[in-house]
């Protein structure tokens, strides 16, 4: 139980800016981190929905509310995944050979493609969030989106080949196996079912679309880069949540 509690706090401190007790790195606890990744999604989702609830009670104008709500998951994660999105976008959009793309991915310099990509992402995501609010949809969906995205993301991390000597391969993949994969996929399926029975078919479509786009992106990244790492995982997660918001605005 102590190891599990330590794993929760390690996961919180690693993937969010939410204050939590600090622990020395523990390999026994580390093998549970990916299984707990969806739990981080639950916390982020609950705070995401809470931000909507508070802003709506304050009668904040919809356009401003959309902008503020949009920033919540990025702020809670310290822009960790958005950074990965920018790095991978820079590499993939360069249209260079595989070796050059990998070199660009490792380069800390902010490239033009990464800037263009993040600006377009946030503009379209803002439009999607504004539309969702304008349609008076059930915003409890904000709780489920981060759980679903992290369940699939965690599954990819424990099941897919890593790029080089990735820190993810060392810290998260070691000690995991088929049981972890089944648990993470099971959580995604459970979230989809709960979404359907509590919110309805349109919300389920958004959750399923997130899963579909994640596998499409995985195939693309594996083809062009050869595997995944932390940046790639962040890239996929950001676009999964983007897809969820966009689909809710469209359907």
From Swiss-Prot:
GO cellular component labels: plasma membrane
PANTHER family xref list: ADENOSYLCOBINAMIDE-GDP RIBAZOLETRANSFERASE
Cofactor: Mg(2+)
Molecular function terms, GO-annotated: adenosylcobinamide-GDP ribazoletransferase activity; cobalamin 5'-phosphate synthase activity
Compartments, as annotated in UniProt: Cell membrane
Enzyme class: transferase
Enzyme Commission number, as recorded: 2.7.8.26
Keyword hit for Protease: no
Pathway: Cofactor biosynthesis; adenosylcobalamin biosynthesis; adenosylcobalamin from cob(II)yrinate a,c-diamide: step 7/7
Pfam family, one: CobS
Function per UniProt: Joins adenosylcobinamide-GDP and alpha-ribazole to generate adenosylcobalamin (Ado-cobalamin). Also synthesizes adenosylcobalamin 5'-phosphate from adenosylcobinamide-GDP and alpha-ribazole 5'-phosphate.
UniProt family annotation: Belongs to the CobS family.
Keywords: Cell membrane, Cobalamin biosynthesis, Magnesium, Membrane, Transferase, Transmembrane, Transmembrane helix
A biological-process GO annotation: cobalamin biosynthetic process
Reaction(s) the record says it catalyses: alpha-ribazole + adenosylcob(III)inamide-GDP = adenosylcob(III)alamin + GMP + H(+); alpha-ribazole 5'-phosphate + adenosylcob(III)inamide-GDP = adenosylcob(III)alamin 5'-phosphate + GMP + H(+)
TM helices/strands, residue ranges: 36-56, 60-80, 110-130, 141-161, 181-201, 202-222, 231-251
Protein name: Adenosylcobinamide-GDP ribazoletransferase
Membrane topology annotation: Multi-pass membrane protein
């Amino acid at each position: 139980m102590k190891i599990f509690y330590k794993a929760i706090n390690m996961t919180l401190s690693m993937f969010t800016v939410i204050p939590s007790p600090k622990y020395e790195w523990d390999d026994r606890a580390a093998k549970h981190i990916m299984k707990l990744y969806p739990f981080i999604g639950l916390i982020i989702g609950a705070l995401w929905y809470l931000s909507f609830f508070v802003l709506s009670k304050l009668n904040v104008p919809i356009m401003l509310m959309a902008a503020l709500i949009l920033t919540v998951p990025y702020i809670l994660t310290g822009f960790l995944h958005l950074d990965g999105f920018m790095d991978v976008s820079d590499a993939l959009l360069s249209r260079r050979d595989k070796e050059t793309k990998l070199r660009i991915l490792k380069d800390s310099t902010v490239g033009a493609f990464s800037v263009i990509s993040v600006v377009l992402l946030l503009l379209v995501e803002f439009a999607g969030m504004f539309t969702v609010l304008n349609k008076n949809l059930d915003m409890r969906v904000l709780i489920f989106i981060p759980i679903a995205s992290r369940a699939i993301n965690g599954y990819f991390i424990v099941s897919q080949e890593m790029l080089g000597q990735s820190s993810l391969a060392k810290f998260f993949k070691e000690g995991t196996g088929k049981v972890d994969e089944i648990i993470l996929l099971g959580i995604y399926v459970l979230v989809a079912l709960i979404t359907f029975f509590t919110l309805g078919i349109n919300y389920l479509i958004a959750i399923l679309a997130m899963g579909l786009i994640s596998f499409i992106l995985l195939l693309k990244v594996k083809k062009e880069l050869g595997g995944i790492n932390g940046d790639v995982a962040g890239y996929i997660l950001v676009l999964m949540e983007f897809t969820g918001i966009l689909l809710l605005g469209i359907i």
